[in-house]
């Protein structure tokens, strides 16, 4: 059986609060595609894999993105350069960066923090998202 990695050897993460300004409503898969394409265009496959972007939560137009600590500047610059999605203008505004989801929700998104297991229970009752 494999042991879990101690905290000193784990990947250091940062959480980024995003606001996406787009004329149509975007779904989670669209936001993932936008972020990955922006990173791929700016820093290539290697930079995208080092950044390891992961969408934690998205409610149009706000979202929370997990990113590697070393690649935060790379993400900022790539998202600021991305200006088009489906041949329509898009603007991605980074509201703030923190090292905890709770802090992101309370300080930047002004949403009370909900324990993760409750979020998963709601999603199971609600069904899959598009």
From Swiss-Prot:
<protein>
    <recommendedName>
        <fullName>Ribonuclease P protein component 2</fullName>
        <ecNumber>3.1.26.5</ecNumber>
    </recommendedName>
</protein>
<dbReference type="Pfam" id="PF01900">
    <property type="entry name" value="RNase_P_Rpp14"/>
</dbReference>
<dbReference type="InterPro" id="IPR038085">
    <property type="entry name" value="Rnp2-like_sf"/>
</dbReference>
<dbReference type="GO" id="GO:0030677">
    <property type="term" value="C:ribonuclease P complex"/>
</dbReference>
<keyword id="KW-0255">Endonuclease</keyword>
<keyword id="KW-0378">Hydrolase</keyword>
<keyword id="KW-0963">Cytoplasm</keyword>
<dbReference type="GO" id="GO:0005737">
    <property type="term" value="C:cytoplasm"/>
</dbReference>
<dbReference type="GO" id="GO:0004526">
    <property type="term" value="F:ribonuclease P activity"/>
</dbReference>
<comment type="subunit">
    <text>Consists of a catalytic RNA component and at least 4-5 protein subunits.</text>
</comment>
<keyword id="KW-0540">Nuclease</keyword>
<comment type="function">
    <text>Part of ribonuclease P, a protein complex that generates mature tRNA molecules by cleaving their 5'-ends.</text>
</comment>
<keyword id="KW-0819">tRNA processing</keyword>
<dbReference type="InterPro" id="IPR002759">
    <property type="entry name" value="Pop5/Rpp14/Rnp2-like"/>
</dbReference>
<dbReference type="InterPro" id="IPR016434">
    <property type="entry name" value="Rnp2_archaea"/>
</dbReference>
<comment type="similarity">
    <text>Belongs to the eukaryotic/archaeal RNase P protein component 2 family.</text>
</comment>
<dbReference type="GO" id="GO:0001682">
    <property type="term" value="P:tRNA 5'-leader removal"/>
</dbReference>
């Amino acid at each position: 059986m494999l042991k879990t990695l101690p905290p000193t050897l784990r990947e250091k993460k940062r959480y980024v609060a995003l606001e996406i300004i787009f004329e149509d409503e975007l779904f989670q898969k669209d936001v993932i595609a936008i972020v990955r394409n922006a990173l791929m265009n700016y820093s290539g496959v290697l930079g995208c894999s080092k950044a390891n972007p992961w969408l934690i939560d998205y409610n149009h137009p706000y979202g929370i993105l997990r990113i590697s600590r070393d690649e935060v500047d790379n993400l900022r610059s790539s998202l600021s350069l991305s200006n088009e999605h489906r041949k329509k203008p898009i603007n991605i505004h980074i509201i703030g960066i923190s090292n905890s989801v709770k802090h992101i929700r309370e300080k930047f998104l002004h949403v009370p923090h909900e324990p993760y297991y409750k979020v998963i229970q709601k999603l199971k009752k609600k069904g899959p998202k598009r």
